[in-house]
């Protein structure tokens, strides 16, 4: 069994915030793969489904970001899971918008949701880092992550979320390479190698050679004798 955790803050006020991209990722997976309706459990919203024989539970903690670990810890204890069974989807300031990376273990890099999870289950869980870009200065980070995605960002955000939905079965199976391939097919589809069709260059106009001059008629060779010519004259 796998526990997919999406990080965010509860309520319509935060629904489209950059900080809530983890919630958005789980909503996409649930919609794409026919998971059960969301219901309240483990201090959050939970939905259940399967990818083949692998059971997957989706969890969106409703404890607010800074206490996300409380909800994750409850679910882990209930299902008797290990940290390696947990995959957390979260916003990542240090990745360009639309980029996605998978990482296991390591620090929380100042992310309050990850810091809380570290405190409850340790660092040895898998993370799906979803790039939202950086505002440029640390003093602007809080306002930036708690602001809605701009309309101009809708296209790459939709591509990223669809790619996550496409690759979710591979992620549950432990094949992060194929998961990343599925995401890339949405966010950076390969360009056609055919290119624009070639057009034949018009043939250069060529002058037709002038017709060969007909050889001039030459008088027949005179073979008659003078006497014969005289006879022919009086005929």
Swiss-Prot record:
Residues 186-235 are annotated as: Disordered. One of its GO terms (biological process) is protein quality control for misfolded or incompletely synthesized proteins. Its main location: cytoplasm. The record marks 9 as: Discriminates between blocked and unblocked aminoacyl-tRNA. It is found in: Cytoplasm. Residues 198-207 have a biased composition (Basic and acidic residues). SUPFAM superfamilies: Peptidyl-tRNA hydrolase-like. The active site is at residue 19. TRNA binds at residues 14, 64, 66, 112. Keywords: Cytoplasm, Hydrolase, RNA-binding, tRNA-binding. The record marks 91 as: Stabilizes the basic form of H active site to accept a proton. It catalyses: an N-acyl-L-alpha-aminoacyl-tRNA + H2O = an N-acyl-L-amino acid + a tRNA + H(+). Its EC number is 3.1.1.29. GO terms for molecular function: peptidyl-tRNA hydrolase activity; tRNA binding. Gene3D superfamilies: Peptidyl-tRNA hydrolase. One of its GO terms (cellular component) is cytoplasm. Pfam families: Pept_tRNA_hydro. Belongs to the PTH family. Monomer. NCBIfam families: pth. Hydrolyzes ribosome-free peptidyl-tRNAs (with 1 or more amino acids incorporated), which drop off the ribosome during protein synthesis, or as a result of ribosome stalling. This is Peptidyl-tRNA hydrolase. It comes from Dinoroseobacter shibae (strain DSM 16493 / NCIMB 14021 / DFL 12). The gene is pth.
């Amino acid at each position: 069994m796998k526990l997919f955790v999406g990080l965010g803050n509860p309520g319509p006020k935060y629904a489209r915030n950059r900080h809530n991209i983890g919630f958005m990722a789980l909503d996409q997976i649930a919609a794409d793969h026919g998971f059960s309706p969301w219901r309240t459990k483990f201090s959050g919203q939970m939905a259940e489904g399967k990818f083949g024989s692998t059971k997957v539970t989706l969890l969106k903690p409703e404890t607010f970001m800074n206490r996300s670990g409380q909800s994750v810890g409850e679910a882990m204890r209930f299902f008797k899971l290990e940290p390696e069974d947990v995959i957390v989807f979260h916003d990542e300031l240090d990745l360009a918008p639309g980029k996605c990376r998978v990482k296991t273990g390591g620090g929380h890099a100042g992310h309050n949701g990850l810091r809380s999870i570290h405190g409850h289950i340790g660092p040895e869980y898998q993370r799906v880092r979803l790039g939202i870009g950086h505002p440029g200065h640390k003093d602007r980070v809080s306002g930036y992550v708690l602001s809605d995605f701009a309309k101009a960002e809708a296209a790459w955000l939709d591509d990223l979320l669809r790619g996550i939905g496409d690759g979710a079965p591979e992620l549950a199976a432990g094949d992060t390479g194929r998961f990343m391939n599925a995401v890339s097919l949405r966010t950076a589809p390969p360009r056609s190698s055919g290119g624009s069709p070639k057009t034949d260059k018009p043939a250069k106009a060529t002058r037709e050679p002038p017709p060969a001059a007909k050889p001039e008629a030459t008088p027949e060779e005179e073979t008659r004798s003078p006497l014969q010519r005289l006879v022919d004259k009086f005929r």
